[in-house]
Amino acid sequence: MVTSLKGRDFLTLADYSREELLFVLETAKHLKQRYLAGERVIPLLPGRHLAMIFEKSSTRTRISFETAMRELGGDALYLGWKELQLGRGETIEDTARVVSRYVDGIMARVYEHEKLEKLAQYSRVPVINGLSDLLHPAQALTDIYTIMEKKGSDLSKLKIVFIGDGGDNVLHSLMLGIGILGGKIIISSPKGYDPDPRIIKLFEEKAVPNGGEYEIIRDPYEAVRDADVVYTDVWVSMGQEAEKEKRIKDLEPYRVTVELMKHAKSDAVFMHCLPAHRGQEVVDEVIDGKWSIVWDQAENRKHVQKAILALIIP
């Protein structure tokens, strides 16, 4: 039985057990129900402050974390990378030491995952991964919450398929989360776009003992046959602009189209963490069509992040 997660960092889902992830998901469900019932502020973190450090820009991450803190009775401070002394040469170590003297938690959205690990190492308060080049755990846990909300809580009974870049940071976190919870994820990507070996190693250590599985199927039509969930993400992330032409060419056969979705179950759902590059990884008819739950998925970011914040910030 989980009693407390206070003071824990939230850098990767691999740091959490099956029971702990379910505890966060159940807390998110409870908080969302109270919000929808009219409780716009649930003061679980009164007087607490969250520093939000952004090396990479964002719409959803900033708004969802900021509103989440305020709805928990706390406050959030936006700190752009260039606005901090980080942009003028101060080390991450010193930044972590100083910022953590002023606030109760730090959320950081960075390019290299190692920066998050260094922040956490030198911070006196919990550090939350708002996105890195390797992982996006808050997004993935939101996705799992949304899948359970729409399709039921037993992931082992669902066929969940990710189409596109197998090295995607959201996919990496989805693999770990779904696997730790005992589910299976199918990845359909071209050769050369497989998951990072570090994630495969973590999956084998943390997910396989819980019954987690993953499978790579190169043919997207074969992969989505009878799928319950079809998920995709952008082909060119921030920092990959130099590879844009090659990536688009390589991944073009993995575009999610109406024809592809017809091979999934009739009640299948389509997911995307957003922002979407319409016409690249997905066509308008899918993201705006009957399969799409992307807007519910985006809304759930706030509720899941409220649970994370409420549970780990002392």
Curated annotation (Swiss-Prot):
Carbamoyl phosphate binds at S58, T59, R60, T61, Q85, R109, H136, P137, A138, Q139, C273, L274, R301. The lineage of its organism: Archaea, Thermoproteota, Thermoprotei, Desulfurococcales, Desulfurococcaceae. One of its GO terms (molecular function) is ornithine carbamoyltransferase activity. This is Ornithine carbamoyltransferase. InterPro entries: Asp/Orn_carbamoyltranf_P-bd, Asp/Orn_carbamoylTrfase, Asp/Orn_carbamoylTrfase_sf, Asp_carbamoyltransf_Asp/Orn-bd, Orn/put_carbamltrans, OTCase_ArgI. GO terms for cellular component: cytoplasm. It holds the Pfam family OTCace_N. It is found in: Cytoplasm. The gene is arcB. Reversibly catalyzes the transfer of the carbamoyl group from carbamoyl phosphate (CP) to the N(epsilon) atom of ornithine (ORN) to produce L-citrulline. It catalyses: carbamoyl phosphate + L-ornithine = L-citrulline + phosphate + H(+). L-ornithine binds at N169, D233, S237, M238.
